Amino acid sequence: MMKINLNADLGESFGAWKMGEDDALLQVVRSANIACGFHAGDPLVMRNTVRMALAAGVSLGAHPAYPDLQGFGRRPMKMAPAELEAAVIYQLGALAGIAAAEGGRLSHVKPHGALSNQACEDAELAATVVRAVRAFDRELILLAPALSELHAVGERAGLRVAAEIFADRAYTDAATLAARTQPGAVIHDHDEIIAHVLRMLDAGGIVAQSGKVMKTVMHSVCVHGDTPGAVQSARRLAETLAAKGWELVGLPEMGE
């Protein structure tokens, strides 16, 4: 049976502010990327999310970001390499500590927002992120967008890298995500989200808005939890994939 992973960015509430339906999404996805306090999340949210993920049998991942709570980590920043490397290690350590206290451990790392977007195009920035991951725990899986610099740099550094595609985001001919400001960049229709994923899996690569196909391996599909109807879309996608013969597994199982 063909294997595929579904992942979601979770734990992005903080304080009195609530984001997403994490408890419901955890019944659908197989891997959770948990905010580590820099773009969202706080110690209590992180702990509660870890507990829910462990109870659901979902693999735990860190979702480190630039220090940008107000901008939700989506604003590009320029940080000195040493500063950024330390910031990523700090976030990994925070979540790993909480996971250990709850009897779990991290399986993967997925950079968030602008940090991910910039690292996907800038090999030097990607190398800084990869150094941080290797320094913290070189057994961690790096979950990186397929065909990105981050993916390539991670592989060259000897990390185990999982290639990610996005269910609800349109692609450019360069295999990058279309800017959120562009029409059609974020896909909201449930049927189109499912069709978009199936097109890519059937084609064996990323399918751009233009129809261009860029061949690549694909290990994981990201379903965003902060879009309207996210849970319904994720549930329908999971059901459709299962009906078409795909086994939904955690990231650590993708290489088995």
Swiss-Prot record:
The keyword Nucleotide-binding applies. GO terms for biological process: carbohydrate metabolic process. InterPro entries: Glyco_hydro/deAcase_b/a-brl, LamB/YcsF/PxpA-like. Its EC number is 3.5.2.9. Signal peptide: none annotated. The keyword Transmembrane does not apply. It catalyses: 5-oxo-L-proline + ATP + 2 H2O = L-glutamate + ADP + phosphate + H(+). Transmembrane segments: none annotated. Keywords: ATP-binding, Hydrolase, Nucleotide-binding. One of its GO terms (molecular function) is ATP binding. Forms a complex composed of PxpA, PxpB and PxpC. NCBIfam families: PRK05406.1-3 (NF003814), PRK05406.1-5 (NF003816). Belongs to the LamB/PxpA family. Catalyzes the cleavage of 5-oxoproline to form L-glutamate coupled to the hydrolysis of ATP to ADP and inorganic phosphate. This is 5-oxoprolinase subunit A. It comes from Azoarcus sp. (strain BH72). The lineage of its organism: Bacteria, Pseudomonadati, Pseudomonadota, Betaproteobacteria, Rhodocyclales.
